[in-house]
Amino acid sequence: MNEFFKKISGLFVPPPESTVSVRGQGFQFKVPRGQTILESALHQGIAFPHDCKVGSCGTCKYKLISGRVNELTSSAMGLSGDLYQSGYRLGCQCIPKEDLEIELDTVLGQALVPIETSALISKQKRLAHDIVEMEVVPDKQIAFYPGQYADVECAECSAVRSYSFSAPPQPDGSLSFHVRLVPGGVFSGWLFGGDRTGATLTLRAPYGQFGLHESNATMVCVAGGTGLAPIKCVLQSMTQAQRERDVLLFFGARQQRDLYCLDEIEALQLDWGGRFELIPVLSEESSTSSWKGKRGMVTEYFKEYLTGQPYEGYLCGPPPMVDAAETELVRLGVARELVFADRFYNRPPC
């Protein structure tokens, strides 16, 4: 009897690896046992669409055509009910039980392969009351596209966090990130707690799909908080490459003290080859303050500036702001597939 159950149980052991085939693209890749589809794809340098990697944003959705998966959590939390019922699942939450055939809305290809390297913090610069620019010098040079991000591991405070590159690749190989002080945040609390110049970090990069798409359409950039970092990085890289397009940059913040890097943005404006408008909007500024600019939510002002020509949306920051901006841009006629977003999720303490 025991031998019988051993044979039966053996039927349910997943293979050492599964093959994921992407319908209509002639593309397939292997997923080792125990890894999610997204995790394995990224390890192999495959540009699988993703954003948060925790099942919230829905960016890594795919349609399961055939095969079975084990879902770590319900994919439904990052998908609408209709999509889930139609067979869509999340790559970050699914471990194959067998070979799969899937369907994607985007064309896969090879991405820049992430590497791991040690890095020394070379500079800390306060940009706002709760934002610091952290510059690091890695042991190995990291190639990345403006708009991508790095996983930053700090052994001293036992934390891993993700931060977007805030400046294009530099000749000396140095890298910059904007770090916001999060209440109770392990890494940000450590960084803000003293001079960390000379401290060693571990970087894994590059990751992420956000970045410039080739077009002549006016760029509607919407940044909330440190969501300015990847947008600034993209715009600065465009200046270096002389690829300027018309830009509307909506910068959402709570109060005047939360606005930062305005000098760098103004320098971009002066050198820009086309239209470049900066529209800061404060949502919680005192009615008795000296602020003469716009108040409320950034989405309230889209209609005033979007006047009919082709547009693309580039949205970075807190998920509620990004979601609201995407909804409003689509309502105003921007095609949803031309709205590119990077949602900043706060990772729980490690």
Swiss-Prot record:
GO terms under cellular component: plasma membrane
Thermal dependence, as annotated: Inactivated at temperatures greater than 40 degrees Celsius.
Coiled coil: none
Gene3D superfamilies assigned: 3.10.20.30, Nucleotide-binding domain of ferredoxin-NADP reductase (FNR) module (3.40.50.80), Translation factors (2.40.30.10)
Activity regulation statement: The reductase activity is completely inhibited by quercetin (a common inhibitor of mammalian oxidoreductases) and p-chloromercuribenzoate, but not by iodoacetimide, N-ethylmaleimide and pyrrazole.
Binding site for [2Fe-2S] cluster: 52, 57, 60, 92
EC number per UniProt: 1.18.1.3
GO biological process: catabolic process
Main location: membrane
Localization (cell): Cell inner membrane
Catalysis: reaction(s): 2 reduced [2Fe-2S]-[ferredoxin] + NAD(+) + H(+) = 2 oxidized [2Fe-2S]-[ferredoxin] + NADH
Keywords: 2Fe-2S, Aromatic hydrocarbons catabolism, Cell inner membrane, Cell membrane, FAD, Flavoprotein, Iron, Iron-sulfur, Membrane, Metal-binding, NAD, Oxidoreductase, Plasmid
Membrane topology: Peripheral membrane protein
Enzyme type, top EC level: oxidoreductase
2Fe-2S ferredoxin-type domain residues: 16-108
SUPFAM superfamilies documented for this protein: 2Fe-2S ferredoxin-like, Ferredoxin reductase-like, C-terminal NADP-linked domain, Riboflavin synthase domain-like
Function: Component of a monooxygenase that catalyzes the first step in the degradation of xylenes and toluenes. XylA is responsible for the transport of electrons from the electron donor NADH to the terminal hydroxylase component, XylM.
Subunit: Monomer. The xylene/toluene monooxygenase is composed of two subunits: the electron transfer component XylA and the hydroxylase component XylM.
Protein name listed in UniProt: Xylene/toluene monooxygenase electron transfer component XylA
Protein source organism: Pseudomonas putida
Organism classification: Bacteria, Pseudomonadati, Pseudomonadota, Gammaproteobacteria, Pseudomonadales
